[in-house]
Regions:
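Bacterial Sec-dependent N-terminal signal peptides
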Residues: 1-31
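Composition- and surface-driven signal marking solvent-exposed, interaction-prone regions
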Residues: 7, 227-228, 381-389, 463-472, ...
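Short, compositionally biased low-complexity segments
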Residues: 19-29, 66-75, 133-143, 260-261, ...
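Membrane-proximal, proline-rich intrinsically disordered regions
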Residues: 22-75, 82-85, 90-93, 101, ...
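Structured, solvent-exposed acidic/aromatic patches
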Residues: 70-405, 440-445, 453
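C-terminal functional modules
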Residues: 398-532
């Protein structure tokens, strides 16, 4: 980790003054980089952190959406392979470094550790540690970011989650005190925070994220009593004054795009004309069409061969997903023959500003509803009705995609060069009445319904959360076992290998952690503590 801890704090893009002559030492100093001892506005550091919090999980074009089994590439030149051939993960220690610096600079500016930047720093660090631990297992945490320790020791995954939950609680407490003495609806930092959220919204985000972390610990809720997983979850739900959470989609933490300098990823990458290279995955499309889910029309277009055979664009059986088990060459041939549905070009490929699709949700209200429903189904929060939160989650997800009862919905085309295919009438009432959607009760069947609907609600948002939920619960059943998976055993991996930086600069501690967890081998098929 040596190379991560000695870099300067932040590059200043435009120098505030011009030097007209060289002075002694100038050749050793970069005038465009702030020294470690400089005072840098906390707002500037916040801007950097919020701009980089999304870790390569751009909608549609990133591999995550293939790994989550939402879409399938039938043409490697544009959308790569579908192989789950994971290797070394990236890391989030850069976020930790900047968060520590934001705390330092905020203390210089405000003279206390109860300011809003200090609170947000706790959230960013907790999120960063959980992000990496979710991928590999044990990680350096307590010693990470200490510039005097170049080879930090590893902390157990349990300790990582325990300490992250404590940091989230600290962040909530600080924000609660600030909100009591200030306007809750005031933006935290209009210049620095690219999410543009208020004090109240940030507090809701932090507590909503804590619910995500707690539900991710469901397999450890009974055999690690000291974590108090169920009690912590119940405390948030039972005390909304102390722990406010999201109440609507308007509280979603969203990353928005524009056509000028932050284009929607498909357009930014130049893939807009190539919608025909991306099919919708069978895993998600089968869940949708089986229950006459109107989100089918938002995500996909009918398989051309089904229309040629005489089916209407509103016929759910005309929507056919591609199976990732199938080798890509076969997928390509079948796609050319019109056998599969394609991603809705009108929605996801047509606008450089992403004007026709939903914004990217980093953390959202629909997920929160399903997390609460899951906890209620599991008996964590007596008195909370799982069915109510399940239905709230479904309706919130429909709202994200702007679907309303009786709406005439235009079915798009394949690549923007052809006429639209027709229209379908959105029928939410019929969808909600389907036997597979009506809540089956606080039992295993009801839990499966909650998890399936959460999975659908994650379409094109929230990064790897679909994968993590599926890894933890087995729901929905992911396609695997075929040659299209691209691993030696044609099975989906359950973790990543450790970052290359750890191998290069912290090898002794890494080897010790591997011995403790996995018998000494860094294996993508080994189960971590979180999901054993």
């Amino acid at each position: 980790m040596k190379n991560k801890l000695i870099t300067p704090i932040i590059s200043i893009l435009f120098a505030s003054s011009v030097f007209t002559a060289c002075q002694k030492g100038d050749l050793l100093s970069n005038p465009n980089v702030a020294a470690e001892t400089s005072t840098v506005p906390a707002s500037l550091i916040l801007n950097h952190i919020t701009a980089t919090l999304q870790r390569g999980e751009d909608p549609i074009i990133s591999d995550v959406w293939k790994y989550d089994q939402y879409f399938v590439s039938n043409y490697s030149y544009y959308f790569g392979s579908n192989f789950y051939n994971w290797s070394n993960t990236g890391h989030t220690y850069d976020i930790v470094k900047y968060a520590n610096k934001m705390e330092e600079q905020a203390f210089k500016q405000f003279g206390n550790k109860t300011n809003v930047y200090y609170a947000l720093s706790k959230f960013f660090k907790a999120h960063s540690f959980v992000w990496l631990s979710d991928r590999v297992g044990d990680i350096p945490m307590y010693q990470a970011g200490d510039v005097t320790i170049l080879e930090p020791k590893y902390d157990s995954q349990k300790e990582v989650f325990k300490n992250s939950l404590n940091m989230l609680d600290t962040a909530n407490t600080i924000l609660g005190a600030l909100i009591s003495s200030a306007n809750a609806n005031t933006k935290v930092d209009a210049a620095g925070d690219i999410y543009g959220m208020t004090y109240s919204q940030w507090q809701k985000v932090i507590n909503t994220y804590k619910l995500r972390v707690l539900i991710s610990l469901s397999k450890r809720a009974d055999d690690n009593a000291d974590l108090n997983v169920k009690a912590q979850f119940a405390a948030i739900i039972s005390n909304p004054t102390k722990y406010p959470i999201m109440t609507a989609n308007s509280d979603n933490m969203v990353y928005t795009y524009n056509s000028a300098y932050n284009q929607y990823p498909v357009n930014r990458a130049g893939y807009s004309p190539y919608g025909y290279a991306a099919n919708v995955n069978k895993t998600v499309l089968d869940l949708l069409t089986t229950n006459k889910d109107p989100r089918t029309f938002a995500f996909a277009v009918p398989a051309p061969a089904q229309l040629t055979a005489g089916k209407a664009v509103s016929d759910f059986t005309a929507y056919v997903g591609a199976d990732v088990n199938i080798p890509q060459a076969t997928l390509s041939n079948n796609s050319t023959a019109g056998m599969y549905s394609f991603i809705n070009w009108n929605r996801y490929f047509s606008s450089a500003a992403g004007a026709n699709c939903e914004p990217y949700i980093f953390l959202g209200y629909p997920e929160m509803c399903f997390n609460i429903a899951e906890a209620a189904n599991r008996g964590w929060i007596p008195g909370t009705v799982a069915a109510d939160w399940y239905l709230k989650g479904i309706n919130a997800s429909l709202g994200v995609y702007k679907l309303t009862q009786g709406q005439s919905f235009v079915i798009g085309n394949l690549d923007g060069t052809k006429p639209n295919m027709g229209t379908a009438t959105i029928d939410i009432t019929t969808f909600l009445a389907q036997p597979g959607v009506v809540y089956a009760g606080d039992n295993a069947s009801g839990l499966t319904q909650i998890l399936n609907q959460k999975y659908i609600a994650f379409f094109s948002n929230s990064g790897f959360q679909s994968f993590y939920n599926q890894r933890r619960t087995g729901v929905p059943a992911f396609s695997q076992g075929g040659a299209g998976i691209g691993t030696p055993n044609n099975k989906i991996p359950v973790r990543w290998l450790y970052p290359q930086d750890e191998i290069n600069f912290n090898n002794a501690n890494l080897k010790s952690a591997l011995t403790t967890q996995f018998g000494g081998t860094d294996d993508v098929n080994s189960l971590m503590w979180l999901v054993k």
